[in-house]
């Protein structure tokens, strides 16, 4: 289907498609953790007198069923897709994954209440020199909203604060890629505190050297 960081969202789409068309009544999306990722950045952490924090195996499971009229639904009519023609520039990828899907449904980027891209815990990635991955993604999404005329440049910090979230997931390979927010999104959707959430899965460019495109 798709690999690496693009795998979780692609798996959820496949599962939701089977449930929606009636091919399967109940579909479980299950993922194990990554042993090679344990203490992957420990050398950099130790150098900076930071405790080696990558000490847990991640896992994920989600049960997808046909629409029962009560549980929040996955919108299969407004899926994002990074096509070959979109190009490999970060702006092009962000547009394909976060601007075009709402547009297909007649919505703006500001109609999405929460965005869930790669949700790596910054307490782990910052000392390792990898930066704050979720924050960087949110700033890029906000900047695209400015370019599309949907928010003002001065509103970027507000957009990031309201529609983003701190990274809270261990660096367990594909596990942090958007899907850990689904449980929280279900609670928020049922409580009525949000109306829409977008789960974003994007693989790294270095994994797609044959096409020079991110997965």
Please tell me what each predicted stretch does.
Residues 1-23, 91, 115-215:
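Claisen-condensing/thiolase-fold acyl-transfer catalytic domains that form or cleave C-C bonds
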Residues 24-57:
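Flexible, glycine-rich active-site loops centered on histidine and acidic residues
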């Amino acid at each position: 289907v798709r690999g690496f960081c693009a795998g979780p969202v692609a798996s959820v789409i496949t599962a939701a498609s089977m449930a929606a068309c009636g091919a399967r009544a109940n579909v479980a999306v299950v993922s194990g953790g990554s042993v090679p990722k344990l203490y992957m950045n420990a050398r950099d952490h130790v150098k900076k007198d930071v405790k080696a924090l990558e000490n847990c195996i991640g896992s994920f499971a989600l049960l997808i069923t046909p629409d029962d009229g009560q549980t929040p639904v996955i919108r299969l009519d407004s899926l994002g897709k990074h096509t070959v023609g979109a190009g490999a520039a970060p702006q092009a990828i962000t547009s394909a994954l976060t601007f075009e899907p709402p547009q297909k449904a007649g919505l703006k980027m500001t109609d999405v209440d929460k965005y869930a891209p790669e949700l790596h815990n910054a307490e782990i990635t910052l000392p390792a020199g990898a930066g704050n991955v979720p924050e960087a993604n949110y700033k890029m999404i906000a900047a695209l909203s400015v370019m599309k005329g949907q928010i003002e440049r001065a509103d970027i910090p507000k957009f990031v604060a309201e529609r983003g979230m701190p990274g809270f997931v261990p660096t367990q390979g594909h596990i942090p890629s958007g899907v850990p927010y689904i449980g929280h999104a279900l609670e928020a959707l049922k409580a009525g505190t949000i109306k829409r959430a977008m789960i974003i899965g994007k693989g790294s460019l270095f994994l797609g050297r044959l096409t020079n495109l991110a997965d």
